[in-house]
Amino acid sequence: MSLFEDLINAKIKELEDLKKNLLIDVETKIRKEAEAVVNKSLERIATVESETLLEREKILYDAVVESRKMIAETYESLLQDLINSIYNEIERMRGSERYINFLSRLLENAVTYIQSKEVVIYASPKDRGVVETLARKLGLSGLIAERDMKGGVVVASKDGSIVVDYSIESIIANKVEEIKHLLYEMTYER
């Protein structure tokens, strides 16, 4: 072989090596770019999935909050309806023996608590006559005055230092938690 052939063969080998390395470099570069595009797409997909999951959780949370609010409003409405029905029943019973006995027990309990028969009694204008009769029957002395209330009585010591509020409104207010519990039990027993 001649020097010329050796140079040509060396250049051919050099070109073949360059071609081989160029293909490997191009293939590696394309693979890296493809992996970068795939990774970026996977990141976008993960972000969209995460945002979708967060949105779903927010929608579920909002729905739960709204349903609890509606349940609370329904219970409040039921409670108010029940209280109004109690007031209506008191109005219907007014003057009956059962209601008169109820007022009598309230007066007796109040006088026992105050420990005096000299008292000031407040009653609904609709109950004043019955309360006057009961006060005489129980030997109570003092003033009987009218007060805007649904029923029951408010009894105070003569000097006003002790007040026993047995108005229907106060009795119901003291029983609201018990009434709520009963409503809850009635609703969930079914």
Curated annotation (Swiss-Prot):
The keyword Cell membrane applies. GO terms for molecular function: ATP binding; proton-transporting ATP synthase activity, rotational mechanism; proton-transporting ATPase activity, rotational mechanism. One of its GO terms (biological process) is proton motive force-driven plasma membrane ATP synthesis. InterPro entries: ATPase_E_C, ATPase_V1_Esu. Has multiple subunits with at least A(3), B(3), C, D, E, F, H, I and proteolipid K(x). Belongs to the V-ATPase E subunit family. This is A-type ATP synthase subunit E.
